[in-house]
């Protein structure tokens, strides 16, 4: 997905063992748009994000990414290997749990998406660390950082390879209100600077209020 791609979700449905999680989900995300997804606990918001990234399989409907030149990538047409390669190149992730590797220093953690693409770019890694206010901490280990600093590492890592789409699942859920607001400031500043689209799952009214659009996921579809 380039920075100018459109995400289109059509009639998406997912169930586990015959039990519906969600159904008839339709929405689109325009290039550079920030969309917040809210909804009751257990309605499948995190599962939906996993489907958007091709990490989880859905049962009905389509997920399509259309580039500015009109080239469409339909995730259902990609096998597991092709999906993984596509995801590594075009999607970034930020989660409530930071998922940093404790045996790697901060700079090495940020560089992971580039490494998976077979790239080495120390200058880009340093630029992202500078952008999130951790420029002097690249050699530190994750256990030496605070929760807010770890989420900054996660943001830098998610955007270091310039993805067109950032998927964020409760990225401020473990943070105090002041730190959460600072992390949201940083997340929005960096995605907008890169022209990336942002899809955010959140229970935070404060975070959702900053979105271009707020969608509510229900068992029977998307509202908003």
Regions found by a protein language model. Give the residues of each.
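ABC family nucleotide-binding domain
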Residues: 5-7, 12-218
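Conserved switch/coupling elements of ABC/ABC-like ATPase nucleotide-binding domains
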Residues: 219-224
């Amino acid at each position: 997905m380039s920075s100018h791609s459109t995400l289109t979700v059509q009639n998406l449905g997912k169930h586990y063992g015959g039990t519906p999680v969600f159904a008839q989900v339709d929405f689109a995300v325009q290039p550079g748009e920030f969309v917040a997804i809210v909804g009751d606990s257990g309605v499948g918001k995190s599962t939906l994000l996993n489907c958007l990234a091709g990490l989880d399989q859905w049962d009905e409907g389509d997920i399509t990414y259309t580039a500015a030149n009109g080239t469409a990538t339909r995730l259902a047409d990609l096998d597991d290997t092709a999906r993984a390669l596509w995801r590594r190149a075009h999607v970034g992730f930020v989660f409530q749990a930071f998922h940093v590797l404790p045996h790697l220093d901060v700079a090495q953690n940020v560089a992971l998406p580039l490494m998976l693409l077979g790239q080495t770019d120390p200058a880009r890694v340093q630029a992202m660390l500078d952008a999130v206010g951790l420029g002097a901490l690249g050699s530190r280990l994750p256990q030496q950082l605070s929760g807010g600093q770890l989420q900054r590492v996660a943001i830098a890592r998610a955007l270091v390879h310039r993805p067109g789409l950032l998927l964020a699942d409760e990225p401020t859920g473990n943070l105090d209100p002041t730190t959460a607001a600072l992390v949201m400031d940083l997340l929005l500043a960096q995605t907008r600077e890169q022209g990336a689209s942002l899809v955010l799952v959140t229970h935070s009214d404060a975070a959702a209020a900053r979105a271009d659009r707020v969608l509510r996921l229900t068992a029977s579809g998307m509202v908003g």
